[in-house]
A protein has these predicted regions:
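Structural and coupling elements of P-loop NTPases
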Residues: 1-201
Length: 201
């Protein structure tokens, strides 16, 4: 979702609208710039996909924390009295998620002990509980092996439950212009790829 910027969780840019759009998705495909090109300026002045990922992660986590805090406030009194078992279970689930978010991690890092806990967590539709795939947009020279930006991102997400795929958008646009399957296969073979990035996605 283009246009999501630092401060979106507080309404910066078109923040709340973008965050609402993300809430409606089944998964997040996060495209990150992983190439240098002096003709294409970066909004933060320097290419750093790890920083870019962390900015978006933080905005999503802050929005989820806002959601969790509101839910905790709603059920806390009932849970403390102890008469309402559903409220107590919900309070425990919300508290577990809150703890993870406060550590700067995503809700998908939380593991639950029962189907009931999983159900309560799913019903929150948290932004950071969605599956995520990071798409590294690289230059043509890095389409096969990746580059140092891709390596840095791989290191940054190694403990996340996330996928990384390397794509050269420029090559993908060239592939899209090729008419026949045979010509596409020949083109891919010439640049050392088995299949297009779109096919891998």
């Amino acid at each position: 979702i283009a246009g999501l910027v630092k401060g979106a969780s507080k309404g910066e840019g078109l923040g709340n609208k973008f965050l609402a759009n993300i809430r409606e998705t089944d998964a997040i495909l996060h495209v990150l710039r992983c190439f240098d090109d002096e003709n294409i300026t970066h909004v933060d002045g320097k290419v750093d996909p790890v920083r870019d990922k962390e900015i978006i992660d933080t905005e999503l986590q802050l929005k989820d924390l806002e959601t969790i805090e509101a839910r905790i406030t709603r059920v806390e009194k009932q849970a403390r009295v102890g008469a309402d078992k559903e409220a107590k279970l919900a309070f425990d689930v919300y508290s577990k998620i809150r703890e993870v978010l406060l550590r700067g991690e995503s809700a998908r890092a939380v593991t639950f002990d029962s189907k009931e806990e999983n159900r309560i967590a799913r019903e929150l539709f948290l932004l950071t509980s969605k599956p995520v795939m990071y798409v590294c947009n690289v230059d043509e020279e890095s389409a096969v092996e990746g580059n140092e930006y891709v390596d840095a991102l791989r290191e940054a997400v190694k403990n996340e439950n996330a996928e990384i795929i390397v794509v050269a958008a420029k090559i993908e646009s060239e592939i899209a212009e090729i008419d026949t399957y045979e010509e596409r296969e020949m083109f891919l073979s010439e640049i050392g790829l088995d299949e297009s990035g779109v096919s891998r996605l």
